[in-house]
């Protein structure tokens, strides 16, 4: 298990290039698909369910790539990117705990969007509460997540599921 409890952007990019958890193990996306600038807190303790939590942030500015194309004249961050950020964090948690394999999102339960992220926002905060971590032949994290923009909760997702797979050939 990696013992650090927070990570800056350069460390997240190293994770994306397979330099944090080892080749063939959990990676974050790089470039435009990395949906966070930092992880401010990660722990196997705490959270709503007492099974661990992760808090991460994304700085918002009007020049972010998605505002230009979604939608011209009505810029808003796509909600699916916030959902993907939550999956990214569950996968990161599994790798951070020392589990092996490549991460894949496996689904979620109920997802609710009750607000939006506009170019005028300053900061998005992602909060993941682990509900269950299975560490057997199958490695899977199940978590609830929320997204806040400038302190106001705007998305929630129940039962986010991410697995780590030593082979994705038959996936």
Swiss-Prot record:
GO terms for molecular function: (3R)-hydroxyacyl-[acyl-carrier-protein] dehydratase activity; trans-2-decenoyl-acyl-carrier-protein isomerase activity. Keywords: Cytoplasm, Fatty acid biosynthesis, Fatty acid metabolism, Isomerase, Lipid biosynthesis, Lipid metabolism, Lyase. The keyword Isomerase applies. One of its GO terms (biological process) is unsaturated fatty acid biosynthetic process. InterPro entries: FabA, FabA_FabZ, HotDog_dom_sf. It is found in: Cytoplasm. GO terms for cellular component: cytoplasm. Gene3D superfamilies: Hotdog Thioesterase. Its EC number is 4.2.1.59, 5.3.3.14. Pathway: Lipid metabolism; fatty acid biosynthesis. It catalyses: a (3R)-hydroxyacyl-[ACP] = a (2E)-enoyl-[ACP] + H2O; (3R)-hydroxydecanoyl-[ACP] = (2E)-decenoyl-[ACP] + H2O; (2E)-decenoyl-[ACP] = (3Z)-decenoyl-[ACP]. The active site is at 70. Belongs to the thioester dehydratase family. FabA subfamily. Necessary for the introduction of cis unsaturation into fatty acids. Catalyzes the dehydration of (3R)-3-hydroxydecanoyl-ACP to E-(2)-decenoyl-ACP and then its isomerization to Z-(3)-decenoyl-ACP. Can catalyze the dehydratase reaction for beta-hydroxyacyl-ACPs with saturated chain lengths up to 16:0, being most active on intermediate chain length. Homodimer. This is 3-hydroxydecanoyl-[acyl-carrier-protein] dehydratase. It comes from Marinomonas sp. (strain MWYL1).
